[in-house]
Structures are given as structure tokens and as C-alpha cells.
Amino acid sequence: MTAQHQSDTLLHRLNTLPPKRYGVFLLNDDYTTMEFVVEILTEIFMLGQEQAVAVMLLVHHEGKGLCGTYTRDIAQTKQQQVMQRAKAEGHPLQCIVEEI
């Protein structure tokens, strides 16, 4: 195998790596209702009711819960949707994005 062929093969592999994944997390607070968190999880993250309740309980008991993993742009959009909805409805709910 020539050096040029090895270089081309490596470049091809680098160009075809999957995009990085980012987790969108909700953070617990003492004021946001559990019902609102479940609403966010079902309407923005499209979780089923049972899964939404499980994530909400994780947020409540552990302080942080993963809502889903996405590419960076989608994760940031989901975060903005959560923050806008929480603000509009008077909840201090916080949402963060972290590279997974």
C-alpha cells in the first residue's frame, strides 16, 4: 500500500465519522411542577407517558435527567424550546446540553 493510498484512506475515514452526539438534560428545582416536566418531555422530546414519568422522577431524585441525545443543532433547538416554554409559563426549569 502506498503512502498516498494510506493517506487517502485515512482522510476518507475522517470525513465519514458520525457527528458528535449531545445530551439534553433537565435540572431539578424546587418550584417547577412534576406535571409541567412531564408535559415538556412528552411534547418537546416526544417521549411516551411512562418514559416521561420515569425521566421526571430521575430529575426529581437525582437532580438531572437525560431527555434525549441529538446532533448539536437539534440539541440546542430542544434546549431553546424548553427554556422558552418554561419562561412563558413562569417556571424556573433549567435545561442544559452536554457532549456525550
Curated annotation (Swiss-Prot):
Disulfide bonds: none annotated. It comes from the Bacteria. SUPFAM superfamilies: ClpS-like. InterPro entries: ClpS (IPR022935), ClpS_core (IPR003769), Ribosomal_bL12_C/ClpS-like (IPR014719). One of its GO terms (biological process) is proteolysis. NCBIfam families: PRK00033.1-5. Belongs to the ClpS family. Binds to the N-terminal domain of the chaperone ClpA. Involved in the modulation of the specificity of the ClpAP-mediated ATP-dependent protein degradation. This is ATP-dependent Clp protease adapter protein ClpS. It comes from Neisseria meningitidis serogroup B (strain ATCC BAA-335 / MC58). The lineage of its organism: Bacteria, Pseudomonadati, Pseudomonadota, Betaproteobacteria, Neisseriales.
